[in-house]
From Swiss-Prot:
Name under which the protein is recorded: Transcriptional repressor NrdR
Zn finger spans (unnamed): 3-34
Organism lineage: Bacteria, Bacillati, Actinomycetota, Actinomycetes, Mycobacteriales
Single GO MF annotation: DNA binding
Organism the protein comes from: Mycolicibacterium paratuberculosis (strain ATCC BAA-968 / K-10) (Mycobacterium paratuberculosis)
Cofactor(s) needed for function: Zn(2+)
Biological function: Negatively regulates transcription of bacterial ribonucleotide reductase nrd genes and operons by binding to NrdR-boxes.
Record text on cofactor binding: Binds 1 zinc ion.
Signal peptide start-end: none
Amino acid sequence: MHCPFCRHPDSRVIDSRETDEGQAIRRRRSCPECGRRFTTVETAVLAVVKRSGVTEPFSREKVISGVRRACQGRQVDDDALNLLAQQVEDTVRAAGSPEVPSHEVGLAILGPLRDLDEVAYLRFASVYRSFESADDFEREIQALREHRGVATPG
């Protein structure tokens, strides 16, 4: 790897450690030319294939910004959004494919968001599933009630 300071084409790894619950490797490097040290983080590439066919890297930030819009005005904090984004990434990575359709990312968001905030879930689902009428909302609300009944036996 090139040194970010002097652009020397080689560097030596001094230390390697797993981070992000084993999803990344943090490497401490040293440049033989200028002697400066720097850190790199390596992760397995996860790509999202959009409907248009364009491929882009998976982005937790993009998941968070989409969900944040659905949570606008709701009592959902940044920690909860970060946890949701981590859950979505874990679900998508668990599929075992280096490329995943954007549709699968949306599906991976729905479950954790439903558990986090039902109103935000309905907002997100209405856009994601292209609701066209009040009947679509009624069906989704009924499914939420059924899920709640299964989740909390009473």
